[in-house]
Curated annotation (Swiss-Prot):
Function: Binds to 23S rRNA. Forms part of two intersubunit bridges in the 70S ribosome.
Protein name in the entry: Large ribosomal subunit protein uL14
GO CC annotation: cytosolic large ribosomal subunit
Organism field: Renibacterium salmoninarum (strain ATCC 33209 / DSM 20767 / JCM 11484 / NBRC 15589 / NCIMB 2235)
Database matches in SUPFAM superfamilies: Ribosomal protein L14
Originating gene: rplN
MF annotations from Gene Ontology: large ribosomal subunit rRNA binding; structural constituent of ribosome
């Protein structure tokens, strides 16, 4: 569960290391975001020479959360960290590589490019 002011690791090679959630997209009163949800965030930590700089406002999709999520078959999935992938305006990932596993929920939300780049889909 990601909300405003949540800090997330960045799971791609855009140059950002950490982002801070500004807003959860998808409704005026929406408070929490889970795997596959899109947020607006600002870059808090970045490496020199990357595609994004500290202070940039970006859109990102959540790929891992610490909070467990119940699936339709009754199983639960949770990860060791909160992580996101930075997106372009058309919904494709801005980076060319994805690090670490991603949730299967991204397939339901039509983030096929992220699914294909990810080393593992859980």
């Amino acid at each position: 569960m990601i909300q405003q002011e949540s800090r997330l690791k960045v799971a791609d090679n855009t140059g950002a290391k950490e982002i801070l959630a500004i807003r959860v997209l998808g409704g005026s009163g929406r408070r929490y975001a889970g795997i596959g949800d899109v947020i607006v965030a600002t870059v808090k930590d970045a490496i020199p020479g990357g595609n994004v700089k500290k202070g940039d406002v970006v859109k990102a999709v959540i790929v891992r959360t610490k909070k467990e999520r119940r699936r339709a078959d009754g199983s639960y999935i949770k990860f060791d960290e909160n992580a996101a992938v930075i997106l372009k305006n058309d919904g494709d990932p801005r980076g060319t590589r994805i690090f670490g596993p991603v949730g299967r929920e991204l397939r339901d939300k039509k983030f096929m490019k992220i699914i294909s780049l990810a080393p593992e889909v859980l």
